[in-house]
Amino acid sequence: MSHQADNKLTLRRDGFTFKQFFVAHDRCAMKVGTDGILLGAWAPLSSVTRILDIGSGSGLLALMLAQRSDTHVRIDAVELDSAASQQAKENISASPWADRIAVYAEDIIDFADTRSADYSLIISNPPYFPPGIACGSAEREQARYTTLLTHETLLRCAHQLLMPDGLFCVVLPIQVAENFIPLAQQHNWYVHQQLRVSEQEDKPAHRVLLALSRQKKECVNASLAIRDEERRYSTAFQQLTKDFYLFM
């Protein structure tokens, strides 16, 4: 039996195994998924010195950015849910970057009110559904719905904490982004980069990754298909995520 097959048989079932770290997510309302992995692999890191992950959940984005960034870069992860923040701490403690990432179990509004604008990159995989159909648990509803963290609050807190030349990166469903972008512009944000993601080359985009700036810059637009027309992972998707996916 091949070494790769051996690895497949021993993968843990309570989380997600990446090439350089493991993310347990059994105590988190929102599990590791393609949206977060795309955002963590794509977010621009040029000249980054300090990073903030808002709504960190299991710590996925903080860990991905720690792997991608220089050793001097420090990362703060803020997560309101106590069970998720504890699991993020455990995931980070077990990773190679435990000394570079700090987890804060608090509301981002309170966090922003006690910090200065010294983050060069802020990243978030935010809730995107308005209150509606129940999710089955209060924790999952908190993670999925904008009840506790509205997009307006998210934009305001990020604006408060970001350095003037920094970037704020999010991933959203296309339909949600259609409302999010005008709202961001009302709060003095400018779209600097935009990656429209489709599930397959012949399908319309269903997600968008945004890099917002406090300064007006030329917007760079791009697109990415996760799979080709034969349902294989596309070359572009493999290139973007190959440092993370175990068998990519």
From Swiss-Prot:
It comes from the Bacteria. GO terms for cellular component: cytoplasm. Its EC number is 2.1.1.223. It catalyses: adenosine(37) in tRNA1(Val) + S-adenosyl-L-methionine = N(6)-methyladenosine(37) in tRNA1(Val) + S-adenosyl-L-homocysteine + H(+). It is found in: Cytoplasm. The keyword Lipid metabolism does not apply. It is an enzyme of class 2 (transferase). Pfam families: MTS. This is tRNA1(Val) (adenine(37)-N6)-methyltransferase.
